Structures are given as C-alpha cells and as structure tokens.
Amino acid sequence: MLSTAAYRDVERELGMGPHGSAGPVQLRFSPYAFNGGTVLAIAGEDFSIVASDTRLSEGFSIHTRDSPKCYKLTDKTVIGCSGFHGDCLTLTKIIEARLKMYKHSNNKAMTTGAIAAMLSTILYSRRFFPYYVYNIIGGLDEEGKGAVYSFDPVGSYQRDSFKAGGSASAMLQPLLDNQVGFKNMQNVEHVPLTLDRAMRLVKDVFISAAERDVYTGDALRICIVTKEGIREETVPLRKD
C-alpha cells in the first residue's frame, strides 16, 4: 500500500492538485528527433566504401523504408549521415551549395580532405545549437588512396581506416575493430584489405545489425568509391 508521501509524489508527477484536480502541466518542445539508421565507412588502398541502411523511423513508427543516408558530394567523395533526418537534409544542402561555389570559383572539385575540413567548420559554427547528425565521409585523397573521416556533432574530426555511426554503431564498431583493424589479436598477419573482402564484410555486419537493432533494416545501400567513379549497390535486409 502506498504511503501518503508516495501518493504526493505520484500527484506531483501527474500534475494533480491535493484533491485530485488537474493542475497546470508544462509541455516541453524538443527541436530534435532521433530517426535511427546506421552508417559505415571503410577505406582500402585504392577504394573507399560508404554504406547505410534505408529505414527512417521514430520511436515505434517507420516513416519510410526507402531513405538511404549516403549522399554523393563529388566523384570521389560520399558522406553518410544518420540521426535527425531534418538536420541531415539541411546539412547536406549546405555542403552541396558550398561545393558548387568552390567549383565555380576555382574550376575544380574540392578534395576529400578539404571537404572534411569544411564540414568541421560548419559543425563548429553551430556548436551552441548543433546539428543532431552523425557524419562520416568516405572517399579518395589526393594520392588516390582510400580515406575515411569521422566527426562529432560540434566539428571535431579525425581520419580513420574504418568507422561506424548511428543506432547500431555499438554493434558494428567492435566487428570492424576485429576484422579490419585486427585489434586485440595475437599472431595474426595484417593482410591488406581487398575490395571483395570489404564488400562481404559490410554486408555481413549490416545483416547482423538488422537482426538486433530495431532502427536498422529494410535495405542496405552501398557506395563504392574508386578511381573510375562511384557505383552503388543495394542489398535487401529484414523488414520487421
């Protein structure tokens, strides 16, 4: 049986007065929403892969099953964004506008490293009201080697060989650490990562993530960046 103090706590949480009458209730507005989704990027010797699922959800509702989170920026650069879908769209539009301005001014496309530095300044400029987005950039650098850049919401970034972000990142990152980075492993030969093995690995980890993460699923969109350009591949995932 609840004590008098416990009843008062319940009344206070429900906004009820001392005699059960409804009291004033404060409604809170949040400018953010989490729309789920997972992005991943892997860099090889002469290629880079950026992949994401296509599910767009909120809570227990699926808004659409065909919303890929990989956006082509140039012929050598792709960005993966997950988090709040509204911020993802806004941020990618700003980046695309900056890239067009740069190309018109310099008669050439911005490099992958320069795009990463530009994105860092954009995110830092919004540090007091940040974009709720997990950003990963994948592409080729000036020497034609694969490059991956990962960001936090306020602009701090670093170059990696592989990175996962989004709702299933806690499941994907340990697999990448083990299979790509060979971390915490003894007597293992560090063989270079081939494109075929990287593709198989990306498909396997996303199939596993879709089994465990309710916000990841429906389909897998893979963008493969090579010196020939960018090609896309779609793989079905579970839809429940």
UniProtKB/Swiss-Prot annotation:
Gene Ontology BP, a term: proteolysis involved in protein catabolic process
Gene3D superfamilies tied to this protein: Glutamine Phosphoribosylpyrophosphate, subunit 1, domain 1
Residues that carry a glycan: S57, S208
CDD domains in UniProt: proteasome_beta_type_1
Record text on subunit structure and interactions: The 26S proteasome consists of a 20S proteasome core and two 19S regulatory subunits. The 20S proteasome core is a barrel-shaped complex made of 28 subunits that are arranged in four stacked rings. The two outer rings are each formed by seven alpha subunits, and the two inner rings are formed by seven beta subunits. The proteolytic activity is exerted by three beta-subunits PSMB5, PSMB6 and PSMB7. Interacts with SERPINB2. Interacts with RFPL4A.
Family classification: Belongs to the peptidase T1B family.
Name of the protein this chain belongs to: Proteasome subunit beta type-1
Source organism (scientific name): Mus musculus
Gene that encodes the chain: Psmb1
